[in-house]
Amino acid sequence: MKIALVAHGDNPPYLKELFNGEGFELVEKECNNEKEYIDLLKDADGALVYLNPLTTKEVMEHCSNLKVISRGGVGVDSVDLEAATELGICICNTPGINTTEVADHAMAMLLSLTRKIREQDALVKKGYWADRTELVHPYRSELGRIAGNIVGIVGLGNIGKSFA
């Protein structure tokens, strides 16, 4: 069975070992337009796609062996679901794969804004911390704290719950 992996620069190296070890043929190629997708997928039984997949009706119509498209990401809005259904192609995704990372990033941004990390980092890089502390001290009194405050979370989906 041939599996096509649309490369995006940093595919995990173990994928080839994993698939080939199970009797699959994994073919990896970077694709930037529909023609390249068709060339890669035309003989494939399955496709692993990640960033900005061009899984349009035209692409799928040219891939008569294609049985499944697995989207390495949360959404499937980049896949023509109507065409896939019409052509009998199963569409999969990886819900929740980035929930923790997005929640952690939101917390990091909150801390960065509250503690003025960017501004203070710039001052330190200019050497103000060591020899011109009077330029840094005004920021110290303006630094916010999260402790004792209420943080509002808009939306309690997977990411909002993880953030909480």
Please describe what each predicted stretch is.
Residues 159:
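Hydrophobic/small residue at the entry helix of a nucleotide-binding pocket
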Residues 5, 151-153:
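Hydrophobic Val/Ile/Leu positions in short beta-strands of Rossmann-like dinucleotide-binding domains
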